Amino acid sequence: MALRAMRGIVNGAAPELPVPTGGPMAGAREQALAVSRNYLSQPRLTYKTVSGVNGPLVILDHVKFPRYAEIVHLTLPDGTKRSGQVLEVSGSKAVVQVFEGTSGIDAKKTSCEFTGDILRTPVSEDMLGRVFNGSGKPIDRGPVVLAEDFLDIMGQPINPQCRIYPEEMIQTGISAIDGMNSIARGQKIPIFSAAGLPHNEIAAQICRQAGLVKKSKDVVDYSEENFAIVFAAMGVNMETARFFKSDFEENGSMDNVCLFLNLANDPTIERIITPRLALTTAEFLAYQCEKHVLVILTDMSSYAEALREVSAAREEVPGRRGFPGYMYTDLATIYERAGRVEGRNGSITQIPILTMPNDDITHPIPDLTGYITEGQIYVDRQLHNRQIYPPINVLPSLSRLMKSAIGEGMTRKDHADVSNQLYACYAIGKDVQAMKAVVGEEALTSDDLLYLEFLQKFEKNFITQGPYENRTVYETLDIGWQLLRIFPKEMLKRIPQSTLSEFYPRDSAKH
């Protein structure tokens, strides 16, 4: 009997299973057989019981033991194949979210095959240098990736005890970031921007120039081959996608970049899986291949709107501005997949880009993102209108991990003090500028005029730099000292006397 069943499996047929015949145990036995169905030996279950289509969702009836998050393959009447995922299960009903959209689905003629597996993505080191669509299929006319592994796109939970606190500063070459909002390797820090601002140019500049300031002993390989970029675009236009692709090609880093592109004309629903595909690939490169991965996700606002669309189709109770109440949790499942893990040399640094609707930082998307991430880089429209690049407003910007990544032995011992003093002087300068608009320049004191001079030179010399100008952190600090010398020593109250006596004199540039 066992031998006959084995031959059946080899020949591609399903082994005959004993059929329950009546009795009180029959129903339980049938359920056990159905739940533990083995897809290697038994054919997959296919249904033509679509009862309705609502937005990106397909509702099926009379499904035998559907499972949450199970992948479903849909075949349309014209032979087109699409993929979906079970979002909700209620008895014999299943709600399936279709990644490629539901246009063209005929309720009577569409067949749905339940695979019995969750959504996995093939991963390989060969994915570097390749371009994929939002569902992970190659769109660069290259061959299908030969997978080294198939990983769950939701990722593996990381034991918090095994996380390493990010302490190595990444030098971006941008003074407003390196000097006052330093980024650590393994940090998640978003760029808060708005429509029409150069956030893509800033992200591309960070990709071009990013590198370690000090190389610690525990990291083995610092070669360029050990650095990788995973770029995920959600709902961006063709111009943005082409900009990043050409920028990576021009600076010779395309071989170390993996791109996932969901464009504005691609299905909205696909945007929900695009960042997860990118992060699963990044986790494989970081923790299996031990690479240092920079993940850029743009535009997270498009992702959140796709989430709202699914929520509305499911007729869930909406939260603020129509976004679902679980959006905070959902965003956390993306942002928290950054960091470093004990025993592995690799790391994942995340820079999500989001465009604030109507430049409103209190909008739910930037508001919830700010709670989860470790700071933000704020791109300001007023600075942009005055032709300042990069238009980073340092006052609302923040890096919560800066304190552990700077200082003696990591950057320079005066770094924290210079940053604090620059912040204080810039904030006072902004207040003086507002007061000048009310009372006029004649009513200002001599100290106020010094702050106004500092304000002008700070924006002109410190914040402003070229898109290909790569400043070291030491050059940034020296520019900071040049600006602080506008004030007499007595006015620099945020800097200790010992640091002032060492760096304030004109020849301190030699340090």
From Swiss-Prot:
Kidney; found in early distal nephron, encompassing thick ascending limbs and distal convoluted tubules and in the alpha-intercalated cells of the cortical collecting ducts (at protein level). Expressed in epididymal clear cells (at protein level). Mainly expressed in the organ of Corti and spiral ganglion neurons, in both the early postnatal cochlea (P2) and the adult cochlea (P30). GO terms for cellular component: apical plasma membrane; clathrin-coated vesicle membrane; cytoplasm; cytosol; extrinsic component of synaptic vesicle membrane; melanosome; microvillus; myelin sheath. Its main location: membrane. PANTHER family: V-TYPE PROTON ATPASE SUBUNIT B, V-TYPE PROTON ATPASE SUBUNIT B, BRAIN ISOFORM. Non-catalytic subunit of the V1 complex of vacuolar(H+)-ATPase (V-ATPase), a multisubunit enzyme composed of a peripheral complex (V1) that hydrolyzes ATP and a membrane integral complex (V0) that translocates protons. V-ATPase is responsible for acidifying and maintaining the pH of intracellular compartments and in some cell types, is targeted to the plasma membrane, where it is responsible for acidifying the extracellular environment. V-ATPase is a heteromultimeric enzyme made up of two complexes: the ATP-hydrolytic V1 complex and the proton translocation V0 complex. The V1 complex consists of three catalytic AB heterodimers that form a heterohexamer, three peripheral stalks each consisting of EG heterodimers, one central rotor including subunits D and F, and the regulatory subunits C and H. The proton translocation complex V0 consists of the proton transport subunit a, a ring of proteolipid subunits c9c'', rotary subunit d, subunits e and f, and the accessory subunits ATP6AP1/Ac45 and ATP6AP2/PRR. This is V-type proton ATPase subunit B, brain isoform. It comes from Mus musculus (Mouse). The gene is Atp6v1b2.
